[in-house]
Amino acid sequence: IFISLTPYQYTYLNKLNGDFATSYNRFENDYLATSIKELIRKIPNNTNIITNNKKIKISFCGAPHNLSRRELDKLKNFDYEVMDLYEGNYDYVIMTNRALADRDENTLKNVKSCFDKIKGEDIIKVERNGLMLSTLRKKL
């Protein structure tokens, strides 16, 4: 099982944690966000958002902005604008399952992962053994 996670071995959880594919509800699995590079590299081959000849409004949740921007800038003919996640005026979100609290509340009662908080359609995913590590999600 360890080899099948390559290069994300640090996401390994043993069988005592239950079903590996649903552990995103209990842990921040890709806490280093290394799957973001793989996710962004899939955009030209797995979507048609580059061929629409329009600027894409994109936001990030749990994904480091500098890493995400650097990888997005490598895509040919990909015109994008980074939008504020909390304002909600984006078309797509690049995300991991990092915990996300409400901006205005300093409590733990409303903390959810990015996967749970941001609704939409997963366009591209990076998965290992059924566990989603990161996704490009289209806003509903």
Residue locations for each model-derived region?
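Catalytic lumenal/periplasmic loop and adjoining terminal transmembrane helix
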Residues: 1-135
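Short beta-strand-to-coil "C-cap" segments at the C-terminal boundary of structured domains/repeats
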Residues: 136-140
